[in-house]
Design a protein with these regions (language model features):
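Short terminal or interdomain "cap/linker" segment that borders an active site or interface and mediates
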Residues: 2-33, 37, 43, 47-54, ...
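Heme-based O2/NO sensor domains and their adjacent alpha-helical segments
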Residues: 12, 21, 48-66, 70, ...
Length: 217
């Protein structure tokens, strides 16, 4: 069991307790297909590598996609400063809702805090480009999401899930426009890279939001 799974069990000890039958038979679990589905749901809820493997199988994320992401590394690295500046200094601090979490008690943009968050986002992107889809990486992704909710973050911090999805969608299209500009003369490479990043984004989004749904994960 991973560190994050162990922490989850401590946060929700009822999930770790042995389930005792109430005496009522659930006929659904007599159906082999439903029983297998339940076991898969249970196993992929707490074992982060099984969760990744299942999601990768669902979206058909393969070694070819990993190679495509590696192909995009030079483009990302060459434009990393511009990408981060755009996300933080053009999008986040100017959005009427998203910017709320980057303001001080007087409502002014807290530039030092923005710079800290920008540096953390850079670390996140660099870790993605390492293409190491191991337990350490996925626990890191989960932690990045978890600190945005009271479970593992600050008690008064809760970033609504739709804002996360909006920002991930924004980053997604920004990167794709960048790839389209850089690879306009190589449509096949563009297809490989954008397809791979799309699949990876959906897997990351799933793991990122695990602790948003802790009580019934």
């Amino acid at each position: 069991m991973s560190i994050m799974s162990d922490a989850y069990m401590k946060m929700f000890p009822m999930e770790a307790e042995k389930k005792v039958s109430a005496g009522k038979r659930n006929p659904v679990l007599d159906v082999p297909e439903f029983n297998r589905a339940w076991n898969l749901y249970r196993d992929t809820s707490l074992d982060i590598m099984k969760r990744y493997e299942y999601m990768a199988q669902c979206v058909n994320f393969t070694d070819k996609d990993t190679e495509a992401i590696k192909e995009s590394k030079d483009i990302i690295v060459a434009n990393l400063k511009a990408i981060l500046d755009h996300i933080y200094y053009e999008k986040l601090i100017n959005d009427p809702w998203l910017s709320r979490w980057f303001r001080d008690e007087n409502g002014k943009i807290a530039k030092e805090y923005v710079d800290i968050r920008r540096a953390r986002q850079q670390r996140f992107l660099v870790k993605i480009l390492e293409c190491k889809w191991d337990e350490e990486f996925w626990n890191f992704v989960r932690w990045v999401g978890a600190v945005h909710v009271p479970i593992f973050g600050f008690e008064d911090l809760y970033i609504p899930i739709r804002l996360n999805l909006a920002l991930w969608g924004y980053i997604h299209q920004y990167l794709f426009n960048l790839f389209a500009s850089e690879l306009k003369n190589d449509p096949e490479k563009l297809r490989r890279i954008t397809t791979a990043w799309t699949k990876l984004f959906w897997i990351i989004i799933d793991v990122y939001h695990i602790d948003y749904f802790g009580p019934w994960m």
